[in-house]
Amino acid sequence: MAIEMQQIIELILAIFLPPLAIFIHGNDCNMHVAVNIILCFFFFVPAVIHALWYCFFRA
């Protein structure tokens, strides 16, 4: 199972800068970016979980 470079970058960004990871993954500023920014202001761990879900587990 090969991991692509973009996935590695998204994983690192999802941990340290969750809104940026969502922005890069979605290629636009959508509702998920706004939700994640709000989560970052209030709770950092849920923002990381949301970014990981959006980048890797969303169908």
From Swiss-Prot:
Pfam families: Pmp3. The keyword Transmembrane helix applies. The chain crosses the membrane at residues 5-25, 37-57. One of its GO terms (cellular component) is membrane. InterPro entries: PMP3. Keywords: Membrane, Transmembrane, Transmembrane helix. It is a multi-pass membrane protein. Belongs to the UPF0057 (PMP3) family. This is UPF0057 membrane protein F47B7.1. It comes from Caenorhabditis elegans.
